[in-house]
Amino acid sequence: MVEVLDWFQLASKKESRMIQMRRDMHQHPEPSFEETWTHNYILNQLRKLDCQIEAPIGRNGIKATFIGAEQGPVIAFRADFDALPVQELNDVPYKSKNEGYMHACGHDGHTAILLGVAEIIHEHRHLLKGNVVLIFQYGEEIMPGGSQEMIDDGCLRDVDKIYGTHLWSGYPTGTIYSRPGAIMASPDEFSVTIYGKGGHGAKPHETIDPIVIMAEFILSAQKIISRTIDPVKEAVLTFGMIQAGSSDSVIPDSAFCKGTVRTFDTELQTHIQTKMDKLLQGLALANDITYDMNYVRGYLPVHNHADAYEVVKQAANEMHLRFNESELMMIGEDFSHYLKVRPGAFFLTGCGNKEKGITAPHHNPHFDIDERAFKYAASEFLKILEIEQVL
């Protein structure tokens, strides 16, 4: 006789446990690639369960495998667990205890959800018809990210398909969002230094003013997006920092800027990078300046595989969650590296709640999570295992 399980009911029974684990981790946020406390916390939870543990994978990663009694598919889920250099301003009992650091992007929630899923799988491991691999990843917030290091160290060995989620405060609790194909952009970073000739502010003719030339570069660079790229293609070029000089009457020797480029394909990446360099070459020729440009390509765009996306959609609908097709998002995620080597899909789990005042955006010192979202994400993962015929 086939045992039929109510995944939402099982996830709901784990709600208080997932909330407690999230709050434990929320009080101990750690920067990317330095997640020692969190690494050990996750290991301590997993050691209570009947699973094979491999650690460290890469630097601080953990791989937990639940092995079924029967042969079948090998499905992986991933959660990240690093925090951000943000000073938390929430007045809550589980506020960060680490000065200057905060779980301001929900990674504590991601990990708590996956640990809750692990406990449910452990309790029903006699039903497994394949293997379930849980990947706990460090260092998502800072390039080059932890995913590629974990892949290189074998975290996807024998895995057939991989899924992941990101809690999202911009969507209400009880919703699941995803889309086939591209869903998240490649987040490139660049910096430019223009070297002119400093001098007295009253005698600009005796100088080569790098501030004016930098201003010309910044304004002209915007035309790369608006005038050289097909308007139906998504691309963003943003300058986030400009730095030059220290006095009102001194023209400095140099000016510096930093920014980001967001695209969904490598051709656009190359086009924008090339155009920026050509623009600087022209300014150098016209103004007798020199320059340095450092352009760093970020994570690959996140591209969901069509069949895995359909599984996410089916799971949400069968669980009576409110499924919606996501908009294209210009944020970056190193989950993309898993999807380059294995089929799979990434989805967003709504965790916003206007009535509770949980509306702050990610990376904000007031960011928080409607913790009721945990049971929705956990039940979605479990339903995916059922559809994939692992549970």
Residue ranges and their predicted role:
Residues 25, 64, 77, 107, ...:
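Divalent metal-coordination and catalytic microenvironments
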Residues 215-391:
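Metal-dependent amide/peptide-bond hydrolase catalytic core
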Residues 2-103, 108, 112-128:
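Acidic/His- and Gly-rich active-site-bordering loop/insert found
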Residues 26-28, 103, 107-110, 166, ...:
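Histidine-centered active-site/metal-ligand motif
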Residues 3, 14-21, 34-45, 73, ...:
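General structural feature for long, well-ordered alpha-helical segments within catalytic domains
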Residues 62-63, 84-86, 91-102, 108-109, ...:
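Histidine/acidic-residue-rich, glycine-tolerant segments that coordinate divalent metal ions
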Residues 28-33, 84, 141-142, 246-248, ...:
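Short, small-residue-enriched loops and turns at beta-alpha junctions
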